Amino acid sequence: MSPTPTTSTNASPARDEVRGVVPKLIDLSEKVLFGDVWERPGLSKRDRSLITVAALMAMYRPEQLKGHTERALANGVTKDEIGELITHLAFYSGWPSAMSAAKVVKQVFEGRKA
């Protein structure tokens, strides 16, 4: 049985950390990004997760990469696919981005074993 795709608008630790500073940004993230954009029918949540992980790796956004890697796994992206994504993008976004992403992803994978 495949996992139920997730785009939970529930508070995340990252969003909670800055909610008091940018409450409107968090509100827009939860209502528009996760409540609307992620719910559009044109792409599956799995595909959106794969695209988002790729974009975050390419833009060198390790803080956001962790949470979206967890979401991608919950949405059915496999560990092998994430590894292939990192390897493939190394040639387009650079070796440093790929190596940093690999470290973040390794932490996520290890956290799921516990």
Model-predicted segments: where are they?
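Aromatic/hydrophobic pocket-lining residues that form the small-molecule binding cavity
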Residues: 65, 82
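Winged helix-turn-helix DNA-binding recognition segment
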Residues: 77, 81
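Short alpha-helix boundary/capping elements
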Residues: 55-61, 90-94
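C-terminal structural segments of small proteins and small subunits
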Residues: 83-106
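Short, structured motif recognition centered on aromatic/hydrophobic residues
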Residues: 48-56, 85-86
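Acidic, glycine/proline-rich low-complexity segments that act as flexible tails and inter-domain linkers
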Residues: 1-46, 59, 66-74, 98-114
